[in-house]
Amino acid sequence: MNMLTALLINITLSLCLITIAFWLPQLNMYTEKASPYECGFDPMSSARLPFSMKFFLVAITFLLFDLEIALLLPLPWAMQINNIKVMMLTSFILVSVLALGLAYEWMQKGLEWTE
C-alpha cells in the first residue's frame, strides 16, 4: 500500500506541475515574449513557412559528410585490429558511396545557386 500511495502522490504532483507550467506563461503576455527571438522570425506567425529546396539539399549533404567523418574518425584505433583488410575495404566502400552521391548531386546541379 505504501508503494501505491507514493505512486499516487507522484502522479498528482506531476499533473499539478504540468498544469501550472501550461497555464502560467499564458497569463502574462508582454512585449518581450511577442518580439522576434534571436533568429528574427515572428513567434506569433505560422511556423509553416516555405523552405528552399537548395538549403535542404545542402543540409542533407552536410549531414552525410558529417556522418562520414564520424564513421571514419575511429580508423586510427581500428588499425590495431587483426583483420585490417576488412576494415580498409569497409572504409573504402563508405568513402566511394559518398563520393558517388556527391558526384551525382553535382551532375544534377543540386549544388548550383544560380538557378
Swiss-Prot record:
Listed GO CC annotations: mitochondrial inner membrane; NADH dehydrogenase complex
A molecular-function term among this protein's GO annotations: NADH dehydrogenase (ubiquinone) activity
Catalytic activity, reaction form: a ubiquinone + NADH + 5 H(+)(in) = a ubiquinol + NAD(+) + 4 H(+)(out)
Top-level enzyme category: translocase
Gene3D superfamilies: NADH:ubiquinone/plastoquinone oxidoreductase, chain 3
Subcellular location: Mitochondrion inner membrane
EC number annotated for this UniProt entry: 7.1.1.2
Transmembrane segments: 4-24, 55-75, 86-106
Pfam families found in the cross-reference section: Oxidored_q4
Alphabetized UniProt keyword annotations: Electron transport, Membrane, Mitochondrion, Mitochondrion inner membrane, NAD, Respiratory chain, Translocase, Transmembrane, Transmembrane helix, Transport, Ubiquinone
Keyword Transmembrane: yes
Membrane topology type: Multi-pass membrane protein
Top-level taxon: Eukaryota
One of the GO biological process terms: mitochondrial electron transport, NADH to ubiquinone
Nucleotide-binding in keyword set: no
Biological role: Core subunit of the mitochondrial membrane respiratory chain NADH dehydrogenase (Complex I) which catalyzes electron transfer from NADH through the respiratory chain, using ubiquinone as an electron acceptor. Essential for the catalytic activity of complex I.
Subunit architecture: Core subunit of respiratory chain NADH dehydrogenase (Complex I) which is composed of 45 different subunits. Interacts with TMEM186. Interacts with TMEM242.
Similarity comment: Belongs to the complex I subunit 3 family.
Protein name: NADH-ubiquinone oxidoreductase chain 3
Organism: Isthmomys pirrensis (Mount Pirri Isthmus rat)
